[in-house]
UniProtKB/Swiss-Prot annotation:
It comes from Adiantum capillus-veneris. The gene is ycf3. Essential for the assembly of the photosystem I (PSI) complex. May act as a chaperone-like factor to guide the assembly of the PSI subunits. This is Photosystem I assembly protein Ycf3. It comes from the Eukaryota. Keywords: Chloroplast, Membrane, Photosynthesis, Plastid, Repeat, Thylakoid, TPR repeat. Belongs to the Ycf3 family. Its main location: plastid.
Length: 183
């Protein structure tokens, strides 16, 4: 029995029922349906903290899924699992792969920034300020990209960018602010 049929959560059950209806109604191939089922099972396992099971489902979905956009979300979710497991280098690889297929994933840029920021803090604790600044600069770049894609989100990142002087003057808010000033 697929994992999605074992859900005890009302929201998960509702999502599963709606997804099953959509899969039956929309014109999809058997391969696309199977890929979606594995993806859905991966999300279900991931939400319950069953990361090994989720990874197995995502890898099966990746073997079947041919749509680049859909693959980006599978790769993103694999990155999330590696982030949760503390395997940041592997997480970054998967976030990069997701962004290669779909450059409009602000959450991937945000997660990459969080990892870089964490590495910057670790470098400070190790006494390497030069390396920490490089990590913080990289975090700033990723956060600027996330904010550019989703300006109403990432308030903490926006504040950090402003406080640390890393909020680029070429950023759209700075440009907008300068263009609205009265001479």
């Amino acid at each position: 029995m697929p994992r999605s049929q074992r859900n005890d959560n009302f929201i998960d059950k509702t999502f599963t029922i709606l997804a099953d209806i959509l899969i039956r109604i929309l014109p999809t191939t058997k391969r696309e349906r199977e890929a979606f089922i594995y993806y859905r099972d991966g999300m279900s396992a991931q939400s319950e903290g069953e990361y090994a099971e989720a990874l197995g489902s995502y890898y099966k979905a990746m073997r079947l899924e041919i749509d680049s956009y859909d693959r980006s979300y599978i790769l993103y979710n694999i990155g999330l699992i590696h982030t949760s497991n503390g395997n940041h280098a592997k997480a970054l690889e998967y976030y990069f792969q997701a962004l290669e297929r779909n450059s409009f994933l602000p959450q991937a840029f945000n997660n990459m920034a969080v990892i870089c920021h964490y590495r910057g803090e670790q470098a400070i604790y190790q006494g390497d300020l030069e390396i920490s600044e490089a990590w913080f600069d990289q975090a700033a770049e990723y956060w600027r990209r996330a904010i550019a894609l989703s300006p109403d989100n990432y308030a903490e990142a926006q504040n950090w960018l402003k406080i640390t002087g890393r909020f680029s003057p070429s950023h759209r808010w700075e440009s907008w602010n300068n263009s609205t000033r009265v001479a």
